[in-house]
Amino acid sequence: MGKPPGARNPAEAEADGDDAVFLELSRELKEEGTRLFNRRDFEGAAFKYDKAVQLLPAGRRVEAAHLRASIAHCYMRMSPAEFHHAIHECNLALEAVPRYSRALLRRAACFEALGRPDLAWGDIRTVLRWEPGNRAARQISDRVRTALEDKGISVALDVLPEDENEIASAKGEERKKSRNKRFDSVAGGREGENGIALLESASTEKQAGPRQTNGTGNHQDHTEDSESNGLEKLEQSTETGEKDMGKKRGAHAAGKKPRCGESKQQKHSAVNHCQDNIGAKEEVMKDVKLVFGEDIRCAQMPANCSLPQLREIVQNKFPSLKAFLIKYKDKEEDLVTITLSEELSWASNLAVSQVPIRFYVVEVNHVQELGVDGVRRRPSFATLERNRDIMLDNGTIGHDVEHKHYADDWMVQFAQIFKNHVGFSSDAYLDLHDLGLRLHYEAMEDTIQREEAQEIFEVAESKFKEMAALALFNCGNVHMSRARRRPCLAEDPLQEFILEKVNVSYDWACTEYAKAGAMFEEAVKTKSDFFEGLIALGQQKFEQAKLSWYYALACKINMETEVLELFNHAEDNMEKGMDMWERMETLRLKGLSKPSKEKVVLEKMVLEGFVKDISADEAFEQASSIRSHINILWGTILYERSVVEFNLGLPSWEESLTVAMEKFKIGGASQADINVIVKNHCANETTQEGLSFKVEEIVQAWSEMHDAKNWRSGPLYFRLQPVFRRRAPKLHHILEHMHYA
């Protein structure tokens, strides 16, 4: 026995019931948003529309697009700063319904308001292809075309008439509207800026029939369901339940006969404006490549492109450029600067067909680009000064044009009265200045020869050394970060290509590591007790050792001596840095009972406010955090060394692993974390699936140990943050994958 035709799965029926509930809630929110919009509460309306979109059942693409367009309208009404949000909502609406002209028009209006007529023209041209009689699109297209022509960019429309009768009726309707001077209005249409109001007023004129919202016929609901581009037909085909809603709306508007003919005439009322452009072909575009150093970007330019147009295209592709020159390669492979539009046509003729033309962009100063066609000469200072004088030549401020410099009479009188009032002679000012400088230098010489001044000089010297060492330390951290540059690999590259890129990246990283090490060493030389430089130097040697080890395995070369030597240097620097910090911490604890020499000097100079003391608890937490992180980093170095020694067959790997576990314990790692690390050592694996350990488990253990100790002990010492929080470079994982692939 089969299932009856009308029988349905209970789960499906329940799902349909839920969809109906959510759909009803969504439409209620939509109506609330419409009421808020009519009250000019655009922010509240946008919030309601967004909630309505979230409650829409899946598959309601048309309603979702309509709501997204309404949200965009709300953003357009708020302020120009919200235009970017409006563009985003229009993009979402077009993703749901690609042929949605209202979203395209609103996005075009936003682009026009933001000063991007080129982007607005693309949307307007698309709408006019679908609807040649769209009045809003025509009005925006006129403004956008004017803006583009002012920039030297010629544009044309490729619009075809839909029907001769429609064109004739559109002409008659246009003449009628011109004669009667009667236009429908929209909510807030007179307050729009940068073409937004014209867009909305024209958009309402092409709607089918004069609908009323909340009993007022002069305000058009900006979220009405009828669309002139076939959106209503699509909605009727996807929603079977719209018939009931249509009946309700029909009953609400009973007694008013819809004027379908007028709707059709309004839709094509602007066809007569596009007759001059009917049949116009789209301008042929050429593909070009714009090369700016290592950055290559593709673009298109018209076949008969002028140099100002090309400079505009380059400026759009590279917005950060202030002044630049455009060059091309001639037959002798020489780079020739393009200064005229004729030279641009020569460069285009040299290009091979079916191959994009390559233009080389070079950034220069403003003086070098003078003389290039399309570049305006900046006015000189004398010209600006002369223009300022001309602007000031207005009424009481006017003066004889032959006198470049002048002083008003009231200025001279005021200066004389002021001198007499205060008894000050301006003629003696120069002598007073020289006398003051002489006394100042004599006082300084007398001061610096005293014994008290020597203590101040010592404190100043120490502070300047610390500042210089810290600057070198930060510069070294910059080079360490540069060494982590990720190699650019294709999705499915060849083995030879990978090796070439890896070799280049390895050389780059080694160079940056060497620069970073030199900076850290110079920092320690500048300030002998700068322990941060030794810790950073130890980590630099450690990262370089790991990179060399992975590179040796991937490329099958012998670098055993170099790797072990780098590990030795890393351990030595960590030990020196730890000892130096322990001595400094001991001296600090001993000096808690008496003030430091620096503090005594600053108190004598009444400058103690420039030194911020931390409490004993904060100092203890900071010391515990530094000790923990140094020991964990030291243990990591020893652990990685044991991995390398095990793979090389050296018996010392057990000793390195044992010392590493001790460092982890001192650093505050839990016994469970240490057991995970020991278990994942390559010596305990029966089958070596990876280079040294299972990445997932070890990363989880490190994360738990790092978070537990770091954030429990308080904030990390700010100077060592880039050292302790630095992750392994991507190149390490690529080399490991190459070795086992």
Curated annotation (Swiss-Prot):
Disulfide bonds: none annotated. Residues 285-364 form the PB1 domain. TPR repeats lie at residues 26-59, 65-100, 102-134, 496-530, 532-557, 558-591, 628-663. Residues 168-270 are annotated as: Disordered. Residues 248-258 have a biased composition (Basic residues). Residues 201-218 have a biased composition (Polar residues). It holds the Pfam family PB1. InterPro entries: PB1_dom, PHOX1-4, TPR-like_helical_dom_sf. Keywords: Chaperone, Repeat, TPR repeat. The keyword Repeat applies. Residues 171-184, 219-247 have a biased composition (Basic and acidic residues). Interacts (via C-terminus) with O1. Interacts (via C-terminus) with OP10 (via N-terminus). Acts as a co-chaperone for HSP90 and is required for proper folding of the myosin motor domain. This is HSP-interacting protein. It comes from Zea mays (Maize).
